[in-house]
């Protein structure tokens, strides 16, 4: 195990989530060129990524710290703090402990596991628990975790994908001589190794388990075997599969499909005996194997050329081979021993149940023709006909080729006639054989006739029929100019090779040896169908339907796909979106061929799968390439990163990112924009900056373009400050930044409402005599006006000649309330002959409304009516708000009529909603009824916003019945009320004493799954129940809502009330709930709980809460401090009281005089005068006077006990005691 776990993973995913739940720590340097540190993997899912926080005020772009916490010097309190919002009820008790016992760690682990099962706890918290686990291991020599704690910890680590940490835990256990006996944990760890494509570690861990006598689960066997088959690890797959069959001797614990894959893999590697052993064991267990497994073993024997054992196997298992298997065997026999012996073997197969078809005889025909035995080939053809089969075109082609090869071309017409009689269409391959054969026989007239016939069938173009002989030569594969048919004019015909019908002596003017070699080669290749070459040709031509059809035919003809054909076919299939899934199925069907693909093809497959979004398959091939050390192209890395940003988890993305960095990956500049966009959306801003640095350095001639693209992407996605920091750094290094970059920064910063930064960039541009673009100016000018920088806005507007700039100025001045300037600007605009926009009237209308200039409002409104300019919704909202507050609601209603003329129904609802809202705000709810009647008359249906306004408005107007009625109507329509509406109705019901209806309402919300985490509503219901004395009902209600996840953010008031009434259990439960919800309770909550515990003399629990309270930064009240001090004194634990007072002083608090006196009196009772005197000194330093009786009593105790203690040299106890300036004599 130690050897296994010490193996460093080849590509370890780094751990990103070392972040506290309350604070984030950042620490990476700007433009750091170091690659991200690898650490343990974490499962973060295809969740929506939350971009990391970055500060823009510094040149240092900061990221989360990826370093693990150094446990040296870490206190238990620090470590427990990270878990205080997960299991506060447990961590609270351990805060005051100097260390942890094994039982404590187990309790903490059990509590954490329980919370983890409820969900909502991520990797960060598991890492925090792991750090406590590690801290406990080293707190003192000899500490040993309990086995159950180790199991729980390992299980949680595996669940979060923290594999490295699990390995460390197991190594630690083995050092202590312990062994984990939970098979499930090891199986889960093997599963993680498989997920990370680390089959080596998975197999080693499996072997270790078996040596320890542990039996993996069925699912573990299955996933491990499937992975080993995928990576073609035959020996390991067989060994584990055999162990599975022998160990799990029950069929319901085995997956026959997985075992079948192993058998196929064994047969592919010619390990047929091992495959047969597996099959026998399955049969011995009573398993009825399907024919596919027997087929695989049979083909394995065939590949091994062990035909005797093949027959023996078939006879033993009584397997009847199908035509695919039988034809495969027959094809191999023909190639190895010839067609005659193959036929004899076929007859033996027939006796064992094999049923041949026309292709079976076609294989025999082809090989007979290849061997030159045309007679037997024709006999086989006759046998096909006699059995009622229809001969295949390849069989006829074989016979035609055989006849031509033997010089029997005169008999070919009989074959052609038979083909026609059987209704077989002559194909291009048949015509090509005929042309080639006639060219071989020097029957060129016949060859011309065939070419003309091909034209009749539409197989060649008309232009090629003009010279049919040249076309015939082209079909054979000759260059027509290199082969000429010439007449021998010599009277002796010395050159004549043959004669035409007219008796002319003719000869071929060409290289006769090459001619004969070519025609013979074509005829030889036509004897047996060469499916591999046909598939390659169809794939390269893009005819994938034909290629796939040939692939199916190939299997029937018993031929195997070659590596080259597979590679070409896969590339073509991947390039076609319609056939992409076919390529995936072929990869799974032929794992051995997939394993043998070359690096270039694998790179191509990854790129195409990524383009089509098949990230899982691209990831599988990528890991295979890494394991086989294939070179990975830059384009492949780019495709993977882009695809994983969209489809895979953050860890998968970072894994590829790390590998790309190690390979010095550099994307093409054209891909950078898309990459930066994807990475930023995934939250990897640090990686974006790193990539930009590399691109910027690597493309010196395109640095301006790279900077522009980088800044554009970051500003669009909301990271303008990061982009600005990068640009400032580049400027500091002497780089020249284009003006367009500044424009992108300005737009981004304005969009992010960081106006001051945008103004700073504007100043920089103006200093450099640069003028912002029109788009930048339109965003800057209104903001400058609102920021009281109208002068700069005017100066900027003068630089741009556009009517849009005038609108921007008017808008900015209007929104800033500078209406006189806006009017002057409008006059200038009109005097320059520029037409005004409808928007200008709307913004001025809004400006006059804000300034309460009603005369101007009416003037602009009249102008808008005359010009038929529709008032915008925003303008109407400003107007109706002012009118309803005046109150002049009739004016608002009148304007609404004008506005509705240009609005669709949804717009009408918005307008009515605004009118209802502001009428309620103006306490004019009677007019609301009229508005509702009007809406009903016009057929305008109220939406969710309307109902919410009505519910809250009527409630605020004390019309509770109407409020409840509209709430009920809203719920009945399936609309979810907002918190404000629910709060208003619940409060009114509770105030009127009808808490039952409030509870019923809450149950309705709960039944619909509406999570309304309103603390006010819950508090109101609970407080009402408590005031009515119905404490059990209040507790049941709170327990139910917290259990169902409907937590309110704050329960402080309820906690205080329950604690005061002595219901501490539910009060503590609510306090814990708040902490789990990452909401820190108020000091009053802790004070009330502590005081309640003190009333029941539960001092230890009270101190637990007190310690937690202080560590959370809360200040206990004086009464809480005092109560603890008094209770500890009463319990004869005065040293604890003393410690509390000192702690209080250390925190800057002032203990009361009564607290000091209580502690001093207790020390006096215990005759501990030294401590008493120390308390008196502290009391005096806090400004309190010690009375004479206390002093004298202490002196008397000192004298009677003869306790003498020298303090400072030459100073007695009495003088030291009475030297405080706070002492006064009684008069």
Curated annotation (Swiss-Prot):
UniProt cross-references to InterPro entries, sorted A to Z: Pentatricopeptide_rpt (IPR002885), PPR_P_subfamily (IPR050872), TPR-like_helical_dom_sf (IPR011990)
Pfam families: PPR, PPR_2
UniProt record similarity statement: Belongs to the PPR family. P subfamily.
PPR repeats: 146-180, 182-216, 217-251, 255-289, 290-320, 322-356, 357-391, 392-426, 427-461, 527-561, 562-597, 598-632, 633-667, 668-698, 703-737, 738-772, 773-800, 802-836, 837-871, 872-906, 908-942, 943-977, 978-1012, 1014-1044, 1047-1081, 1082-1116, 1117-1151, 1152-1186
GO cellular component, one term: mitochondrion
Coiled-coil features, chain-numbered ranges: none
Record keywords, A-Z: Mitochondrion, Repeat, Transit peptide
Name this polypeptide is given: Pentatricopeptide repeat-containing protein At5g15280, mitochondrial
Gene source species: Arabidopsis thaliana (Mouse-ear cress)
Transit peptide: 1-31
Compartments reported by the entry: Mitochondrion
């Amino acid at each position: 195990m130690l050897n296994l776990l010490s193996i460093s993973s080849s590509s370890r995913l780094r751990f990103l989530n070392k972040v506290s739940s309350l604070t984030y720590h950042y620490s990476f340097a700007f433009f750091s060129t170091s690659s991200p540190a690898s650490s343990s993997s974490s499962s973060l899912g295809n969740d929506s990524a939350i971009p990391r926080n970055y500060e823009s005020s510094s040149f240092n772009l900061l990221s989360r710290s990826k370093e693990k916490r150094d446990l040296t010097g870490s206190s238990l309190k620090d470590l427990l703090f990270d878990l205080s919002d997960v299991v506060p009820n447990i961590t609270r008790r351990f805060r005051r402990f100097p260390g942890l016992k094994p039982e404590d760690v187990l309790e903490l682990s059990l509590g954490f596991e329980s919370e983890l099962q409820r969900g909502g706890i991520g990797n960060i918290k598991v890492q925090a628990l792991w750090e406590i686990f590690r801290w406990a291991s080293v707190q003192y020599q000899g500490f040993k975790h309990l086995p159950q704690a180790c199991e729980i910890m390992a299980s949680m680590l595996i669940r979060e994908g923290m594999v490295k940490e699990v390995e460390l835990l197991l190594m630690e256990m083995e050092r202590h001589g312990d062994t984990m006996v939970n098979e499930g944990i090891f199986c889960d760890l093997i599963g993680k190794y498989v997920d990370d494509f680390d089959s080596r570690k998975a197999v080693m861990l499996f072997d270790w388990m078996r040596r320890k006598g542990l039996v993996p689960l069925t699912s573990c066997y299955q996933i491990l075997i499937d992975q080993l088959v995928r990576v073609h690890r035959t020996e390991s797959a067989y060994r584990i599969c055999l162990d599975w069959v022998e160990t799990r001797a029950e069929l319901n614990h085995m997956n026959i499909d997985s075992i079948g894959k192993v058998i196929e893999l064994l047969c592919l590697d010619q390990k047929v005996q091992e495959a047969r052993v597996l099959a026998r064991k399955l049969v011995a267990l009573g398993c009825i194997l399907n024919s596919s497994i027997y087929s695989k073993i049979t083909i394995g024997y065939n590949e091994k050329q062990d035909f005797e054992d093949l027959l023996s196997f078939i006879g033993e298992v009584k397997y009847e081979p199908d035509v695919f298997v039988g034809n495969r065997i027959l094809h191999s026999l023909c190639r190895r021993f010839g067609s005659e012996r193959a036929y004899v073997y076929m007859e033996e197969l027939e006796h064992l149940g094999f049923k041949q078809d026309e292709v079976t005889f076609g294989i025999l025909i082809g090989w007979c023709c290849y061997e030159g035995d045309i007679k037997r080939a024709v006999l086989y053809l006759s046998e096909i006909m006699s059995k009622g089969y229809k001969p295949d075109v390849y069989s006829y082609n074989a016979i035609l080729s055989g006849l031509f090869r033997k010089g029997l071309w005169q008999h070919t017409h009989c074959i052609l006639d038979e083909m026609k009689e059987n209704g077989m269409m002559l194909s291009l391959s048949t015509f090509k054989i005929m042309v080639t054969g006639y060219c071989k026989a020097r029957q060129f007239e016949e060859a011309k006739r065939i070419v003309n016939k091909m034209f009749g069938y539409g197989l060649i173009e008309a232009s090629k029929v003009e010279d049919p002989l040249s076309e015939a030569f082209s079909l054979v594969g000759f260059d027509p100019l290199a082969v000429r048919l010439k007449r021998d004019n010599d009277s002796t015909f010395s050159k004549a090779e043959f004669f035409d019908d007219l008796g002319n002596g003719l000869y071929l003017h060409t290289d006769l040896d090459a001619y004969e070699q070519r025609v013979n080669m074509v005829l030889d290749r036509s004897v047996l169908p060469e499916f591999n070459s046909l598939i390659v040709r169809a794939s390269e031509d893009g005819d994938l339907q034909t290629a796939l059809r040939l692939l199916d035919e190939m299997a029937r003809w018993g031929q195997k796909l070659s590596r080259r054909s597979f590679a070409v076919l896969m590339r073509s299939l991947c390039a076609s979106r319609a056939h992409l899934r076919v390529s995936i199925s072929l990869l799974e069907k032929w794992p051995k061929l997939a394993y043998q693909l070359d690096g270039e093809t694998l790179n191509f497959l990854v790129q195409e799968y990524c383009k089509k979004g098949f990230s899982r398959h691209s990831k599988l091939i990528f890991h295979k390439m890494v394991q086989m050390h294939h070179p990975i192209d830059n384009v492949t890395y780019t495709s993977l990163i882009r695809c994983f940003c969209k489809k895979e988890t953050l860890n998968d993305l970072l894994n590829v990112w790390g590998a790309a960095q190690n390979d010095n990956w550099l994307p093409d500049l054209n891909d950078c924009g898309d990459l930066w966009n994807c990475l930023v959306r995934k939250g990897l801003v640090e990686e974006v900056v790193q990539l930009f640095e590399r691109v910027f350095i690597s493309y010196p001639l395109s640095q301006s373009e790279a900077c522009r693209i980088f800044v554009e992407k970051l500003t669009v996605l909301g990271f303008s400050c990061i982009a600005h920091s990068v640009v400032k750094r580049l400027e500091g290094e002497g780089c020249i930044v284009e003006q367009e970059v500044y424009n992108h920064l300005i737009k981004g910063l304005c969009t992010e409402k960081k106006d001051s930064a945008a103004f700073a960039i504007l100043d920089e541009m103006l200093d450099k005599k640069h003028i912002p673009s029109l788009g930048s100016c339109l965003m800057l000018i209104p903001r400058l006006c609102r920021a009281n920088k109208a002068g700069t806005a005017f100066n900027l507007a003068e630089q741009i000649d556009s009517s849009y700039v005038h609108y921007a100025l008017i808008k900015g001045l209007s929104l800033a309330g500078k209406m006189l300037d806006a009017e002057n600007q409008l006059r200038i605009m009109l005097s320059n002959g520029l037409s005004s926009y409808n928007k200008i009237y709307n913004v001025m209308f809004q400006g006059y409304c804000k300034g309460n200039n009603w005369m101007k409002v009416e003037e602009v409104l009249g102008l808008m009516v005359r010009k038929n300019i529709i008032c915008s919704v925003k303008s109407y909202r400003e107007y109706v708000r002012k009118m309803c507050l005046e109150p002049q609601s009739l004016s608002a209603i009148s304007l609404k009529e004008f506005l509705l003329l240009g609005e669709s129904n949804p717009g009408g609802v918005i307008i009515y909603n605004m009118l209802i809202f502001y009428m309620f705000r103006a306490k004019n709810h009677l007019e609301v009824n009229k508005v509702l009647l009007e809406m009903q008359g016009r057929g305008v249906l109220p939406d969710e916003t309307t109902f919410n306004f009505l519910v809250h408005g009527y409630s605020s107007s004390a019309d509770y019945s109407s409020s409840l009625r509209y709430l009920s109507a809203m719920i009945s329509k399936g609309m979810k009320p907002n918190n404000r509406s629910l709060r208003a109705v619940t409060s009114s019901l509770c105030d009127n004493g009808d808490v039952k209806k409030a509870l019923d309402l809450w149950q309705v919300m709960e039944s619909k799954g509406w999570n309304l985490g309103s603390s006010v509503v819950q508090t109101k219901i609970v407080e009402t129940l408590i005031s009515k004395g119905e404490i059990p009902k209040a507790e049941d209600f709170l327990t139910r809502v917290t259990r169902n996840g409907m937590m309110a953010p704050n329960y402080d008031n309820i906690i205080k009330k329950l604690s005061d009434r002595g219901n501490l259990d539910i009060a503590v439960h609510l306090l814990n709930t708040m902490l789990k919800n990452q909401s820190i309770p108020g000091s009053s909550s802790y004070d009330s709980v502590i005081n309640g515990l003190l009333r029941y003399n539960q001092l230890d629990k009270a101190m637990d809460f007190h310690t937690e309270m202080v560590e959370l930064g809360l200040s206990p009240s004086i009464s809480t401090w005092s109560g603890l001090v008094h209770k500890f004194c009463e319990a004869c634990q005065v040293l604890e009281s003393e410690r509390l007072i000192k702690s209080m002083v250390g925190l800057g608090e002032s203990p009361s005089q009564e607290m000091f006196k209580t502690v001093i009196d207790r020390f006096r009772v215990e005759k501990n005068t030294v401590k008493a005197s120390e308390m008196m000194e502290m009391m005096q330093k806090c400004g309190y006077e010690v009375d004479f009786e206390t002093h004298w009593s202490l002196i008397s105790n000192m004298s009677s006990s003869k306790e003498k203690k020298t303090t400072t040299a030459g100073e007695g106890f009495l003088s030291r005691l009475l030297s405080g300036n706070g002492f006064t004599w009684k008069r």
